[in-house]
Amino acid sequence: MAAVRGSPPEYKVRAVEEIKRMISSKPVVAIVSFRNVPAGQMQKIRREFRGKAEIKVVKNTLLERALDALGGDYLKLKDYLGDQIAIITADENPFRLFRMIEDTKVPSPLKPNQVSPVDVVVNEGPTPIPPGPLMAELQMAGLPVAIEKGKVVVKATTTVVKAGEVVRPEVARALERLDIKPIKIGLDVKAMLDSGVILTPETLAIDTEKVLEDFQRAYQMALNLAVNSAYVTEETAEILIMKAVMDARNLAINAGIFEKGVMEDILMKAHAEMLSLASLLPDEALDEELKSMLSGIAEAAAQATPSVEEREEEEKPEEEEEEEEKEEEAIEGLGALFG
């Protein structure tokens, strides 16, 4: 006789219903891996997410049943099941939620026989390890070490393990001695579903500072283009009015248009041009008033610029002081020599 499968246990039915409620109640759903995350860190993450997002550790089989029951775009998340997973649901922007999840990661040491996800480089320089038997542990890890000025130093920058390699126990122990924590442990986003669109870590991991700089640069370029093409907007109206006033003022002054707002500037410009022309004429062509004005300008210029003699006089006392100091040092040296 063929075996007849009975109804699933009640606790599994309730678990699937709870997962369905979580997923369908929020616009953003994330599947994350929590492999190697300590229980204490997981509790801290729950506390930090409280009021911002809901997190729940789930079994792959139960999550798959919930997704099948919901159907539609939720089925896209089935491609990211596997491993030790949890679901996070939130009203938050997916990029901001991704940043929140990434911020849960903390530096962690590599464990013996673990596959390293990164290249681990120990830089040249002093270490916190005192001379003694611990030096041998560093040498067993392949580090060129020596004692200099009472300290153990690494003589050359060394890659002790490459990405994809198994971490030897000697290397793990040496890195722990050096307090090197090359990896970060925390929740790893596998995928997010936002309004029917799947977002992967490659899409979500954006450099917010660079994006902000790009927006600022684009805004400045757009503002410059709008101002130079006289395109009136809320942002450019004030700048364009100020520019128009300046251009009109300059035109009126240079064209000699007698308007109340520029009369004083026109007279000042004409006066300056008159004095410039007068300075090119011989004295006999000038009246006493012009001669007086030109001489006043010359005297003011002379007072503003110190003469060569004055500069030399200012430098002499400094040179004399330096010579006196040298003589005093020489006398002191002779005194020390002859007791």
From Swiss-Prot:
Keywords: Ribonucleoprotein, Ribosomal protein, RNA-binding, rRNA-binding. GO terms for cellular component: cytosolic large ribosomal subunit. One of its GO terms (biological process) is cytoplasmic translation. PANTHER family: 60S ACIDIC RIBOSOMAL PROTEIN P0, LARGE RIBOSOMAL SUBUNIT PROTEIN UL10. Forms part of the ribosomal stalk, playing a central role in the interaction of the ribosome with GTP-bound translation factors. Part of the 50S ribosomal subunit. Forms part of the ribosomal stalk which helps the ribosome interact with GTP-bound translation factors. Forms a heptameric L10(L12)2(L12)2(L12)2 complex, where L10 forms an elongated spine to which the L12 dimers bind in a sequential fashion. This is Large ribosomal subunit protein uL10. It comes from Archaeoglobus fulgidus (strain ATCC 49558 / DSM 4304 / JCM 9628 / NBRC 100126 / VC-16). The gene is rpl10.
